[in-house]
From Swiss-Prot:
Entry superkingdom: Archaea
CDD domains: CBS_pair_ParBc_assoc (cd04610)
Pfam families: CBS, ParBc
Protein name: Uncharacterized protein MJ0188
CBS domain boundaries: 9-64, 67-126
Keywords: CBS domain, Repeat
Length: 265
């Protein structure tokens, strides 16, 4: 089943009108950090204005005189396949596209980051499905919730991670591209057993990110799980206990420090 644009597009779009001026657009550029804005009239898309359109233009020039008109624009629809849209963006060089309905009403905007995020997140459900299947086969009653969890309440079950992958996860966190982790919550205490996503969790811990998106499997039990017992044998109580291994030599552990920007220190 294909992923639709509507599942990942931003619905609250910053727009301008044809009567706004270049000065107004410059102000919005500074306030939002965006590099282009759809131009709407009564909810209908009539054009788009970008930073390239206003370079060298008089501050008082009207947007309608510098914008790219609707007939010359590339747009997409909510029910379009997000990967097809990604290919269009790659070929045209656009970093984002307006999303319109059948009557040309602007209903959202989709960016290349949204396309990437859709592909990252789709890998998680299969892992989750396998973990759920395992615990159901062991006779546990469970439910699954997608929520934010406190990074400091995560208990690792893996004693080492790789330095190069950690840097990659730090980058993803900064860009908002990290997929949700998978954790288990029992009735034993106020903590979460980290099952999948150790690089992401340690990256968040090192960067001072307080919460992470997670699929939490709630098990209806107060018994200590096997993976908890294994973690105790490895003396894993918090993310601080996870060793960062130089990927060139998995058998040697270097002390590697990171600042909040993910830079080696």
């Amino acid at each position: 089943m294909s992923v639709k644009v509507s599942e990942y597009m931003t619905k609250k779009v910053v727009t301008v009108s044809k009567d706004n001026t270049v000065k107004d657009v410059i102000k919005l550029l500074k306030e939002t950090g965006h590099n282009s804005f759809p131009v709407v009239e009564n909810g209908k898309l009539i054009g788009i204005v970008s930073v390239h359109d206003i370079v060298g233009k008089d501050d008082n020039e009207k947007v309608e005189n510098v914008m790219t008109k609707r007939k010359d624009m590339v747009v997409t629809t909510p029910d379009a396949n997000i990967m097809d849209v990604g290919r269009i963006m790659f070929r045209t060089g656009f970093s984002k596209l307006p999303v319109v309905d059948e009557e040309n009403n602007l209903v959202g905007i989709i960016s290349n980051m949204d396309v990437i995020r859709s592909q990252i997140e789709k890998t998680t459900p299969k892992k989750l499905e396998n973990i759920i299947k395992t615990y159901k086969s062991l006779g546990y009653n469970l439910r699954v919730e997608k929520e934010e969890v406190d990074v400091n309440k995560l208990r690792p079950t893996q004693n080492k991670i790789h330095a190069d992958e950690l840097v990659g996860r730090m980058y993803e966190l900064k860009k908002g591209l990290a997929e949700p982790i998978i954790a288990i919550k029992t009735k034993r205490g106020d903590y979460y057993i980290l099952v999948d996503g150790h690089h992401r969790a340690v990256a968040a811990y090192k960067m001072g990110v307080p919460k992470l998106d997670a699929y939490v499997i709630y098990l209806d039990t107060d018994k200590k799980l096997g993976i908890e017992k294994t973690a105790e044998i490895m003396n894993l109580k918090s993310l601080e206990d996870v060793k960062i291994v130089d990927s060139d030599d998995e058998n040697s552990v270097k002390v590697i420090k990171y600042n909040k920007n993910g830079v080696l220190g």
